[in-house]
Amino acid sequence: MRTNQYANFPKDFLWGGAIAASQADGAYTVDGKQPNSSDVQPYLKGLSNEEIQFLEKQGMTVAMVKEGLADTTHFYPKRHGIDFYHTYESDLELLAEMGLKAFRTSIDWSRVFPNGDENTPNEAALAHYEKMIDKIRAVGMEPIITMLHYEMPINLTLTYGGWTNKAVISLFERYGKCLLDRLGHKVKYWIVINQINMIQIEPWLSLGICKDQYENMAQAEYQGVHNQLVAVAKVRAYAKTLDAELQMGTMVADGTVYPYSCRPDDVVLAMQHNRMQYFFTDVQFRGEYPKFAWNYFKENQISLEVTEDELQLLRENTMDYLAISYYFSQMVDATKNTNKADAITPNPYLEANPWGWEIDPQGLYNSLSQYWDRYQKPILIAENGFGMYDKIEAGKIQDDYRTSYLGDHIEQVGRAIYDGAEIIAYCAWGPIDIVSCSSQQMSKRYGFIYVDIDDEGNGTRKRLKKESFNWYKSVIESDGAQL
């Protein structure tokens, strides 16, 4: 290990780990659960990582969703996860050995309201999640709970058209109120919707919309996220009537880009690209739609259905903290790219993992600094991690590539704190191996704990500590002073 030159983390800093129900829980048909948006994504055997990621970005059609529901041939990894639904007690005890001070996970909407539009919740699901949260607290961790992390009930996608339908606002509001009523006295930190800005990268998982249902997909995406923003504001308003001390956060996947060069066209495109990423957080922290967003909508033939009551609700219900995920930085070249979230160019100065995710610790420092300067709101790092193939040799997994990545990024978190940013938590993504969100693979591993399951669901399910397990334990014990 090495000494962190920016070892100035506050004593109440939350060193944690994060997973999602859709990638970990499994128990696909247990306790009344119905399918959700993640359950219809198959593992695409025989394809390269590049091919898998290309197909994932293409989105889903109604036919693909229905085929997924009826399919008995292919393997759907997220239906099985790592069976965390049944193993959470022992898994949390194992994670607690590292000294985690916080644990982030999500509640599956399709368990609590299996079809999304029921009048009453599923008690079996609520009882399960209450017991899980009790266990998180019992082992000494602060629960950080996400209400929606890519677990939209399939019925709401096929019957209602996903988040483009304003009826879904009230359905989600009912769900959110239900969680707060049952669990609000046990959970201080809530993330209402995971990565709310991923509408152009993952429209199916983010919004539950099928690409063949709309001629203008951008129109559907931004109408969908407007409805999400309204729903978040409604849930936040209700939370504050229950307990003013509840911390209601919004979350984005960091999409900050660099210009390819100092050529003015590159610099301006990067600025425009970044502003449309700040759009989501501008609304939720400044309470208003920025003028540049209205200009963008007009230029792209996007006409939103927005009411004055909704705009007033947004003004009155700004969020308490910003949660971000950060894995890599991005770059734009005006000769090749447009002002669209996935229009990016590889950075020749950075190395990447086998999935093309570029490694840029200073990019995290840059993004944290930009967010802090813009909003002056507490920041919670909800996800940061390094997906890689792990190999067992002589009964051990030597994953120094993971500790190197995480150590370099944690140092940059300390650097942002040194500059004055208020950062309250760092949650390593996937502290125990789970199914990859973007590729449906188990072999894309992030954890400090290895789970013996392969990409096709085979394996003993046994847990094995990697070398990084003791490394992260030492990081926490030293409050980030030793990396």
Task: Label the predicted regions.
Residues 2-72, 115-117, 126-483:
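Active-site region of glycoside hydrolase catalytic domains
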Residues 73-87, 164-166:
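Active-site mouth loops of central-metabolism enzymes
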Residues 80-93, 114, 125:
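Internal amphipathic alpha-helical repeat/solenoid segments
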Residues 87-108, 316-322:
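Catalytic domains of carbohydrate-active enzymes, especially glycoside hydrolases
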Residues 107-121:
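Glycine-rich, proline-tolerant flexible connector loops at the mouths of alpha/beta enzymes
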